[in-house]
Swiss-Prot record:
Key words, A-Z: Protease inhibitor, Serine protease inhibitor, Thiol protease inhibitor
Domain of life: Eukaryota
GO molecular function: cysteine-type endopeptidase inhibitor activity; serine-type endopeptidase inhibitor activity
Role according to the record: Inhibitor of subtilisin. Inhibits moderately trypsin and chymotrypsin (serine proteases). May protect the plant by inhibiting proteases of invading organisms.
Keyword Oxidoreductase carried by entry: no
Organism for this UniProt entry: Solanum tuberosum
Family: Belongs to the protease inhibitor I3 (leguminous Kunitz-type inhibitor) family.
Name of the protein: Cysteine protease inhibitor 2
Tissue: Cortex of tuber.
Amino acid sequence: LVLPEVYDQDGHPLRIGQRYIINNP
C-alpha cells in the first residue's frame, strides 16, 4: 500500500505508524 505524503504547515511529512494525518487548511 502506497500512501500519498501529507505535509503540515511547516512542510514536514506527518505520519503515525502507517497512517497519515491530513490537516484541514
